[in-house]
């Protein structure tokens, strides 16, 4: 009986111990916060989004490459899928039979090239972090 209790106790201790996640933030995606006021100071192109605050994020799809998305403030946790800003993101969503679930927040006729380049830069920085830290 004592061996059984000892075994169960040891199993519970091991099973409930937290796993070290020192590289959890280097999963391969990244983001940058953007806002209308700061955009006008840093970029010559007009702010392309209909909301004052949001997040440009980047991820990687094995078949389509680097994906760039925009999510308005309040829709940026992992349960949301942002609006795709580049072809890779749109193709990845279509391929995976997924859809954006955030409010569409892109100005009509907006030039998204600067926003996409910002997202791709985030991808580059994240990949560099992965190379240097793993």
Labelled PLM ranges:
Residues 2-9:
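Sec-dependent signal peptide recognition
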Residues 5, 45-47, 112:
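Residues embedded in well-ordered secondary-structure elements
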Residues 14-15:
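C-terminal motif of bacterial Sec signal peptides marking the signal peptidase cleavage site
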Residues 19-69:
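N-terminal secretory signal peptides
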Residues 68-100:
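Flexible, solvent-exposed short loops/turns enriched in glycine
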Residues 92-134:
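C-terminal partner/receptor-binding element of secreted or periplasmic proteins
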């Amino acid at each position: 009986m004592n061996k059984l209790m000892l075994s169960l106790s040891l199993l519970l201790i091991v099973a409930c111990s937290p796993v070290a996640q020192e590289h959890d933030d280097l999963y391969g995606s990244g983001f940058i916060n953007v806002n209308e006021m700061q955009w006008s100071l840093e970029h010559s192109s007009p702010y392309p989004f209909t909301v004052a605050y949001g997040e440009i994020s980047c991820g990687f799809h094995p078949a389509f490459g680097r994906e760039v998305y925009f999510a308005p403030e309040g829709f940026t946790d992992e349960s949301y899928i942002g609006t795709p800003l580049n072809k890779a993101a749109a193709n990845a969503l279509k391929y995976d039979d997924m859809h954006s679930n955030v409010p569409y927040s892109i100005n009509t006729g907006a030039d998204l090239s600067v926003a996409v380049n910002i997202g791709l830069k985030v991808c580059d920085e994240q990949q560099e972090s992965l190379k240097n830290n793993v």
